[in-house]
């Protein structure tokens, strides 16, 4: 199957997680013209597609068409991330969190979220 979705991002508004979500990195991806789908809570940006809360069946269909997701800093092995790995998606993680990678190492792509030049690493895959 052709993977025609660049990113699926699991976004949850939570007061304790707000500082962990890579808003700036998402904006840099949008500026670089990546196609981004947001699931769960809505991210207010006109260039992303918000799906909201969807069934696991529909999520699985989207994951089969997607290339990447972004690992959450507080839990890089969330159920969502593990499902993405089973659908052969690459997991983008901020380089400063690379020490958290213990399993499925080949599924992770380490990027400095502060350096926009590193977006080229994604485009080359």
Kindly give the residue locations of the regions a language model identified.
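Short alpha-helical segment that forms part of, or immediately flanks, the ligand-binding pocket
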Residues: 60, 81-86
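Short hydrophobic beta-strand element within catalytic cores of glycosyltransferases
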Residues: 90-96
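Conserved active-site histidine-acidic residue motif and adjacent donor-binding/catalytic loop
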Residues: 42, 48-63, 76-77
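Conserved catalytic-core segment of nucleotide-activated headgroup transferases in glycan assembly
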Residues: 2-47
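Acidic donor-binding loop of glycosyltransferase active sites
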Residues: 64-76, 89-90
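Short glycine/proline-enriched, acidic/aromatic patches that form the donor-sugar handling elements
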Residues: 59-60, 77-78, 97-103
């Amino acid at each position: 199957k052709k993977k025609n979705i660049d990113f699926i991002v699991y976004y949850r508004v939570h007061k304790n997680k707000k500082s962990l979500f890579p808003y700036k990195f998402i904006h840099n991806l949008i500026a670089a013209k990546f196609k981004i789908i947001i699931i769960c809570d809505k991210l207010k940006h006109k260039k992303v597609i918000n799906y909201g809360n969807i069934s696991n069946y529909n999520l699985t269909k989207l994951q089969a068409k997607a290339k990447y997701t972004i690992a959450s800093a507080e839990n890089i092995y969330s159920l969502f991330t593990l499902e993405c790995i089973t659908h052969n998606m690459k997991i983008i993680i901020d380089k400063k969190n690379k020490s958290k990678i213990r399993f499925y190492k080949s599924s992770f792509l380490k990027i400095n979220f502060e350096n926009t030049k590193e977006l080229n690493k994604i485009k080359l895959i």
